């Protein structure tokens, strides 16, 4: 069961992302988000008739405000202490910083979960986790590789909000009305991130509205449907490239996450 975030709170969260280190401005949004999460937890326990005593712990990664492992920095919205206090449950949080301090990327987190639930499998297996950004888990026996492949829904949803006044492209119906702009696609794929070898991670610090506008400015006006179609194919290509380069022998590929549908 899942609970959505109302549009007004989503807008506040987006504003916080523009100033990730202005903690004073984040206080109200942080409180609202934490309150929403607390209410959702209580609703889930009530809906499924689960006792608090049956819950071992809650994993809370928060909503990422800034993720810059090269600068030893990763921050998020949401107060785990408040959530623990109001639900009387153990809350585990701040997953990323320790790994970053040890020289890691702090992301993606899903690779640990994918490895754990499949630890007895010895065959080649691949997971693609689709959210705002896409990450991949490549598992072969005890060997596991996980990294971000690039944008998934983030650029697509952003374009839909600005150009179609829609939160997302339901069923890819809007993108299907356009054509792939091959020259724009080539420009997008030429980004330096795709030349970096894993382990690596990325986010809206690298791929955002300004980044997209920089590439669009190289061409005369492109039909909004064509841009959306190109962004969608861009996501597909970057995922396929990652599979082909690091695990071409994969025969089982599982898609998961909010964008899997």
Predicted segment positions?
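Short helix-loop-beta connector
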Residues: 51-54, 121-123, 247-251
């Amino acid at each position: 069961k899942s609970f959505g975030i109302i549009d007004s709170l989503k807008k506040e969260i987006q504003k916080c992302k523009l100033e990730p280190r202005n903690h004073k401005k984040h206080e109200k949004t942080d409180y609202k988000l934490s309150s929403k999460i607390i209410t959702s937890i209580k609703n889930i326990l009530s809906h499924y008739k689960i006792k608090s005593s049956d819950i071992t712990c809650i994993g809370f990664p928060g909503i990422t405000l800034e993720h810059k492992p090269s600068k030893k920095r990763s921050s998020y919205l949401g107060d785990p202490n408040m959530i623990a206090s109001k639900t009387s449950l153990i809350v585990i949080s701040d997953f990323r910083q320790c790994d970053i301090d040890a020289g890691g990327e702090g992301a993606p987190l899903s690779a640990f979960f994918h490895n754990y639930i499949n630890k007895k499998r010895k065959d080649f297996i691949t997971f693609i986790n689709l959210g705002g950004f896409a990450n991949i888990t490549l598992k072969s026996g005890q060997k596991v590789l996980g990294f971000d492949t690039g944008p998934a829904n983030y650029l697509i949803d952003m374009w839909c909000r600005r150009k179609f006044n829609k939160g997302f492209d339901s069923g890819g119906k809007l993108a299907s009305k356009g054509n792939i702009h091959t020259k724009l696609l080539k420009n997008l794929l030429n980004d330096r991130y795709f030349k970096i070898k894993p382990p690596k991670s990325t986010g809206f610090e690298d791929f955002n509205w300004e980044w997209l506008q920089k590439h669009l400015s190289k061409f005369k006006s492109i039909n909004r449907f064509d841009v959306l179609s190109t962004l969608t194919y861009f996501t597909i290509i970057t995922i396929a490239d990652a599979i082909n380069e690091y695990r071409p022998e994969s025969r089982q590929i599982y898609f998961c996450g909010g964008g899997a549908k």
